[in-house]
């Protein structure tokens, strides 16, 4: 099984000017050195977050949980039967138990859902579940990393966001097309600019959804912040030629680079771009109070709060 070692984690933080660290990609609680790595990270001047199905939170002591700036729980459906069918029996209860525990400890909670064909019209309902814990809902669009079974059609993508934004208040949007159509200004940072993904295979990628194995960690050790000038990071920042004259260029940058790369169309506009189809949907948004959410700048995402 691929796993980063504690020494590799230390090396990454020594070579990069890190402000925040998210522990994602699978259940970190299954790593034999999870607690040792967490103990080290707690000594560093970084904002620490974790994404979990509940297991990695359940194995930690209360004092360890208090080290986190935010704890994310993966919940894709608003009912127990649907969630347990997708994630395994007992997952709904585990998430509710551990989210309630975090709230009791004063640790901020976020619910993270993937917008996909099976739930795209029901995410406002998931947001209402999140609100039971005083938590926002963070939404990532399904990316066809292994299969396109759950991938949204063009119409489903836009209908999903219209429904979601009609029933929730927006904390932040970094999903490029949605941000542009909501009339929000350009956002600094993002994939290929200010984030580095270090995989369990000890490789680096500019985006969590970037296809391929990634570049060996030795490249980061040699170049440090210079990793941002490597080929894959430059590709993640590339704006398609067809988008150069678009009025939304500075906000959208051609859409999600990871999605374009996955679809073998890095140099083409995002599949979900309405402008290329001669359309211009306007998304009406009502803003909520801002929150300090480090994950906002590390992926194309949307954060909302149920009304």
Model-assigned labels for residue ranges:
Residues 1-67:
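Conserved alpha-helical substructure of the radical SAM core
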Residues 8-30, 270-307:
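Short Fe-S-cluster ligation motifs
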Residues 27, 55-56, 116-117, 143-144, ...:
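Conserved beta-strand edge residues that scaffold enzyme active sites
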Residues 31, 58-60, 120, 147-148, ...:
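Short secondary-structure boundary/hinge segments and terminal tails
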Residues 53, 63, 85-86, 210, ...:
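Residue-level signal for well-ordered alpha-helical positions
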Residues 174-280:
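Accessory C-terminal segments flanking Radical SAM cores
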């Amino acid at each position: 099984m691929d796993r980063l070692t504690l020494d590799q984690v230390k090396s990454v933080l020594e070579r990069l000017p890190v402000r925040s660290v998210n522990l994602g990609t699978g259940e970190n609680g299954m790593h034999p050195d999870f607690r040792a790595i967490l103990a080290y990270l707690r000594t560093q001047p970084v904002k620490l977050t974790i994404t979990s199905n509940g297991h990695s939170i359940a194995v930690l002591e209360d004092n360890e949980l208090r080290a986190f700036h935010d704890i994310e729980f993966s919940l894709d459906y608003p009912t127990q039967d649907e969630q347990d069918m997708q994630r395994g029996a007992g997952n709904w209860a585990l998430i509710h138990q551990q989210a309630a525990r975090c709230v009791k400890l004063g640790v901020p909670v976020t619910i993270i859902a993937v917008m996909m064909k099976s739930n795209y019209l029901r995410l406002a309902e998931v947001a209402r579940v999140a609100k039971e814990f005083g938590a926002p809902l963070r939404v990532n669009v399904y990316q066809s990393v292994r299969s396109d079974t759950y991938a949204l059609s063009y119409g489903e993508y836009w209908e999903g966001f219209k429904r979601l934004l009609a029933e929730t208040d927006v904390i932040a949007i970094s999903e490029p097309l949605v941000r542009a159509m909501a009339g929000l200004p350009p956002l600094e940072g993002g994939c290929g600019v200010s984030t580095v993904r270090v995989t369990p295979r000890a490789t680096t990628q500019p985006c969590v959804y970037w296809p391929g194995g990634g570049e060996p960690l030795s490249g980061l050790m040699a170049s440090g912040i210079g990793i941002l000038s490597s080929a894959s990071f430059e590709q993640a920042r590339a704006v398609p030629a067809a988008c150069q004259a678009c009025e939304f260029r500075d906000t959208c940058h051609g859409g999600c680079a990871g999605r374009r790369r996955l679809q073998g169309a890095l140099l083409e506009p995002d599949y979900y771009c309405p402008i290329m189809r001669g359309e211009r949907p306007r998304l009406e948004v009502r803003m909520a109070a801002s929150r300090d959410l480090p994950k906002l700048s590390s992926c194309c995402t949307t954060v909302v709060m149920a009304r």
